[in-house]
Regions:
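Charged interaction scaffolds used for protein-protein
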Residues: 1-147
Length: 147
């Protein structure tokens, strides 16, 4: 048993926090890409709010993975992951919505296409890049094709 304290709840509004259970798998990714007001993008979120919203996603990923993490480690991974995503100019990760980020991380942790050895900045970032190259790219292309 460990003596670690439970993770504190972030200061962001509860309704805005995208948890791993909140995403709707029936929503078409093309619809998500077409409607940035309904599905806000990470690039449109202020840095402090983005870290606060990423924290429960990372914490949920650690719980799903069965990996024990303290609050400081979760905040570190969330902060580093947000910084990496916002600095990305090659793969288009800045245009991902919070719903997509939660979905991708959940699928990666629960046994997606690649083997995931633990929850870290590198593994979560790798899952997001793989998504952006495949499904995300296809959804982006279809979203902006003329009808």
């Amino acid at each position: 048993m460990s003596n670690r304290t439970p993770l504190p709840v972030p200061n962001a509004k509860e309704s805005q926090l995208p948890t791993l259970a909140q995403y709707n798998p029936k929503v078409d990714l093309v619809e998500v890409r077409r409607d940035p007001q309904k599905y806000p993008r990470i690039s449109a979120t202020p840095l402090a709010d983005a870290v606060a919203q990423m924290t429960p996603i990372v914490y949920g990923a650690a719980l799903y993975r069965g990996q024990e993490m303290g609050a400081a480690q979760v905040r570190f991974i969330a902060n580093a992951l947000v910084s990496e995503i916002l600095a990305d100019t090659k793969f288009g990760l800045r245009s991902l919505s919070w719903m997509e980020i939660g979905m991708v991380i959940r699928n990666a942790v629960l046994g997606g296409a690649k083997e995931m050895y633990g929850v870290s900045v590198a593994t979560l970032y790798s899952a997001l890049v793989d998504y952006a190259k495949t499904e995300g790219h296809d959804a982006q292309t279809k979203a902006y094709q003329p009808k």
